[in-house]
């Protein structure tokens, strides 16, 4: 039998009460209630970070958990950990936080809260380490060619010279993300493009929203399966491409 949405939400409610947490909750329902995404933001676990070496504004980051059910047509439920950015309401997931807890509909799900609860504190520690990482990325200023090289390595995104018209959807997406980057720079009070601006623009593209046009370039999606797929792709990009690039730069490398 398919996993009932209420079983997941009740288990999460039990878990949250046990931990004495008061998250901000946003719920999305799909297919007449048979599929869902619920976003739990744990703001009491977050903090402000500076958005660049010359940035004039801070932003608030905190751990969050996304609870998905039947997101891929196979009646699979999953909890995904991410970092919530209050400036643009993005959810920033990494490869090592994408599958906090995964459950097929053929398995008993009654113990979800117990299993998750036994690991939740260490999981918050892991997400707070990601917040530290994101803050360090705000100190890495990068040039146009670095931006292009990074964007071209996102699955499903291509990038054209801005003097040429975008033809394919992947190119149009690349152009939208590139335009979003400069909006991020201005909004965050930065002097130049830094790695944080790029990550924020890309995670605009991968964050599920009720109104997909809620940011100026309409990068977001309100489709459950598309949103989860993008989140997976961007999580891999952050972990496999951006993190090594940043580590190299912080160590004094050029590439």
Where are these regions (language model features)?
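Feature for intrinsically disordered/low-complexity regulatory segments and propeptides
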Residues: 1-11
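A short acidic/basic microdomain associated with nuclease active sites
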Residues: 17-44
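Intrinsically disordered, low-complexity regions enriched in serine/threonine
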Residues: 28, 43-255
